């Protein structure tokens, strides 16, 4: 099951690479990563690059999650992951839900693999980023981490394809 921006910021040609990570390479979640091999972003203002890259670094520091692009919106999920995760419990409303989804999958023990992509900023339209969305992400990550210290996560089911 894929998630991607519909404004072609994510290249549809990369869908097969994300699919291959799950179908052939044993990943449960494949993340189209802007930051796996440096910063691969085209036509974003420097302030947005710094904010996005910094946010991913912050999330990694707070959560310990080994994902370089924690805010990525280009993701392939095996259906079993989404069935297992209790999506009705996702609390974040803004872009931070991207972080919550990856962190929850990670805590359940699902295998996350990043696939390097180049993100090209949209030609038309504007970002929905706001101070409220930014605050939700900053403080929400701390809440996620604190919750994870006091609650257990049901282990991911064993895959039947020996991966």
Please provide the spans of the model-predicted regions.
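Short, hydrophobic secondary-structure boundary micro-motifs
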Residues: 30, 69-70, 114, 150, ...
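Catalytic donor-sugar/metal-binding loop of nucleotide-sugar-dependent glycosyltransferases
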Residues: 66, 89-93, 102-119
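DNA-recognition element of transcription regulators
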Residues: 99
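Terminal low-complexity segments of carbohydrate-biosynthetic enzymes
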Residues: 13, 24, 80-81, 109, ...
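The conserved acidic donor/metal-binding loop of glycosyltransferases
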Residues: 5-9
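Acceptor/aglycone-binding surface of glycosyltransferases and processive sugar-polymer synthases
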Residues: 2, 12-95, 122-139
């Amino acid at each position: 099951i894929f998630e991607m921006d519909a404004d072609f910021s994510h290249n549809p040609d990369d869908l097969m690479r994300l699919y291959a990570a799950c179908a052939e390479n044993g990943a449960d979640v494949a993340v189209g990563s802007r930051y796996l091999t440096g910063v691969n972003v085209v036509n974003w203002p420097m302030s947005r690059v710094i904010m996005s890259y910094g946010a991913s670094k912050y999330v990694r520091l707070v959560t310990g999650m080994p994902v370089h692009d924690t805010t990525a919106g280009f993701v392939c999920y095996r259906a079993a992951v989404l069935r297992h995760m209790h999506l009705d419990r996702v609390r974040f409303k803004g872009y931070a839900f991207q972080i919550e989804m990856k962190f929850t999958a990670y805590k359940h023990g699902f295998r996350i693999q990043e696939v390097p992509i180049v993100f090209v900023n949209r030609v038309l339209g504007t970002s929905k980023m706001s101070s409220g969305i930014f605050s939700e992400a900053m403080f929400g990550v701390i809440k996620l981490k604190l919750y994870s210290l006091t609650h257990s996560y049901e282990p991911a089911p064993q895959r039947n394809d020996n991966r």
